[in-house]
Amino acid sequence: MIKKRKLGKTDLLVSEIGLGCYQLGGYSKINEISVGFGEMDEKIAVDIINAALEFGINTFDTADFYSLGKSEVRLGKALKDCRNEINFFTKAGSVASYTDSAFEIDLSYHHLMASIDRSLKRLETDYIDLFQIHKSPQSEEDFSSIEKAFTAIKSEGKARYCGASVANRYQIGIELMKRGLVDTLQLYFSLIDPAPLSELFSVAKHEGVGIIIAEPLAQGMLTGKYKPGHVFPDSDIRCHSYDNDLLQKKLEKSQEFQFLVNEDRTASQAALSYILSRDEVSICIPGAKSVKQLKSNVLASEIELSEEELEKIKNIQQAWN
């Protein structure tokens, strides 16, 4: 059975591997730009959600922007009969833009309050376990509106806890924690994106902030499925997320960790085990596009990398700097 960890100073006990749910909504596009991970039939999405429950996953991370709300809709429909046994994490602040880009950022009080109401409806629930801003604050006005919205959301019982998804804006994450604005912080961290996190982890421990790792498989680049030279189709958001040089550089880096793969563990399992080797981490939230892939991810909860392997990983990462 998958292990559980406490989410910071909250009273939430989360499966140390959750399910990132971006892909569950299927294909969507804005201004001819894909904002999904390709097609996914609703039946496949429901099969993955049901399998997650069977495997012991109790935490599902989504956002109102994911497939323009369809990820939330599918989750709400599939999980409404077991609401008390699971945790819904969702996010707001990324807004579909029909001008010259796929999205804009809106962290205003009115937008966040309206967004959580829409998410509650799509998720078919009367409360959300963790409501997060989806983008980092850009100004003092943003910090102020976030504080006001989070206070209202909690006092009205619409969310039990509030947090921020800051991607790789680590200093912003530290500032949010020091101001006492967040119960959790979601950020990027993986074998090929190791990041300087010692200060952030130290502040999180001091403030009791739960750490959620997004993209622990680097959007699939650590699964072993994609080799240097791979090009994602236009229907996949990854086609637009990276220029080709950066994509190929990340894929080349991923090949340096093949020594972690053996008959007892896959590339994905090794990558997730690396994340879970950090006690500061409460949960990582890889996505999955099949039940088979999901089951493989869950098995990482039973794997531990050796001290020698962790040291070799550290040496490889330091050589990149």
Annotated model-derived regions:
Residues L120-S139:
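Active-site groove signature of glycoside hydrolases
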Residues M1-I86:
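N-terminal binding-site loop/beta-alpha segment at the start of enzyme catalytic domains
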Residues E39-A52, L107-L123, N168-E175:
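Short, acidic/polar
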Residues G26-N31, V95-A102, Q293:
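A short acidic, helix-capping loop that chelates divalent metal ions and anchors anionic groups
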